[in-house]
Amino acid sequence: CLKIFKPDAIVETGTHTGETTAYMAKESNLPIHTCEIDKRYYSYAKLRCQNFDNINFYNNSSDIMLEDLRAQLKDKRIFYYLDAHFFDDLPLKREIEIIHNSSESYFIMIDDFQVLDDAGYGYDNYGKKGVLNINYIEDLVGKYDLQLFYPAIKSEAETGYKRGSIIITSLCEVSRVTEIGTLRKVK
């Protein structure tokens, strides 16, 4: 995905233990901005990733970090990895709103998302707060004409963690995203 989208930076919400952060820092060498609201996870991830000089850590909520980065990242191609859905707050809709209102060109990946036509992929269900699926974000899809893509690979062919995901792009990025053979457009 990163090779085709060619972002200038990566923004991750929900650092947790820094596993994904370290992977992206090593594989991309791009500037990474990542936030973790929980002080313990934030401290652990900073320690774990201390050898990477391309990571900027924020001990904040995701919406605060995204707002703070708006001016700095304006007019840049950003890959957003949204994974800040763990505790009582489910900031996903606010995150998408901020991103859409900050840039014309964006590429968002949401982790732990239900792939509606493939039950083999795991996803997060927050009860009354919502299930991470298209129904949860459908009002934003219509409001902003968001373009949605699921993994093209069936869950039974996956290795490792079989967690669902979705890619969201702005309309201007659809042609670029369709070049990614591991994604398929959501109908």
Which residue ranges define each predicted feature?
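SAM cofactor-binding core of SAM-dependent methyltransferases
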Residues: 1-66
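Short, flexible loop segments at the rims of nucleotide/cofactor-binding pockets, characterized by
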Residues: 9-11, 85-88
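Acidic active-site catalytic centers that drive phospho-/nucleotidyl reactions
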Residues: 12, 36, 83, 111-112
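Short, well-ordered coil/turn elements that cap or connect secondary structure elements
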Residues: 27-29, 50-52, 75, 103, ...
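Catalytic metal-binding/acid-base residues of hydrolase active sites
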Residues: 38, 63, 85, 113-114
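Short conserved loop adjoining the S-adenosyl-L-methionine
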Residues: 65-74
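Short SAM/SAH-binding signature in class I
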Residues: 73-82
